[in-house]
Amino acid sequence: MMNLTNWSRGAAGGTIALLLMIGTPVHAAENPQVAAEIMALARSQWASEIAGEPMAQQNSTLAEDYTEFNGDFPTLLVGKTMSTRMGEVTPNDKAMYSDMQNGRVQVYGDTAILTYNFAGLRRGADGKVAPALAKSSRVYVKQGGQWKLVHANFAPVAAGH
């Protein structure tokens, strides 16, 4: 009978602890090292684009099941393969400059969310340079010891707003 009582107390204590953990809000951890790694991944993708490297190289950090929302398509784009094939179509413009403003990384274990304002310059087919501005979010997950981009949302912002 004593073992049953001890077990019951342990089970009750464990249940209470579990309920307290479930009710506790999750807060992002401050991790400057992970924040630097995540921001560097976005910047390296931009550098690869500006250098004109192949799309496979530009998309090397995308997960196979990558998804994206952007201002060019009204639907969810699904898959690294789709993203790479769409990027291989010769664009009418070229990235000349890309920068991250107000970057913030929230870390939740093996998940990191990068939120920032994108400020870039693109040269159009007519040779004119125009700003490229967006409110952006990227979600990275650590897979096999490497950070992989699993989702992105790029919301264009009109110049001057």
What are these regions (language model features)?
Residues 49-50:
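Hydrophobic/aromatic side-chain positions at a characteristic register within alpha-helices
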Residues 113, 133-158:
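Short beta-strand edge/turn micro-motifs at domain boundaries
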Residues 32-39, 53-108, 117, 130-132:
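A solvent-exposed, acidic/Ser-Thr-rich amphipathic alpha-helical stretch
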Residues 2-15:
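Bacterial N-terminal signal peptides that target proteins for export
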Residues 18-27:
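C-terminal segment of classical bacterial N-terminal signal peptides
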Residues 29, 125-131, 159-160:
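A short acidic/glycine-rich loop-to-helix N-cap element
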Residues 120-124, 140:
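Beta-strand elements of well-folded, non-transmembrane domains
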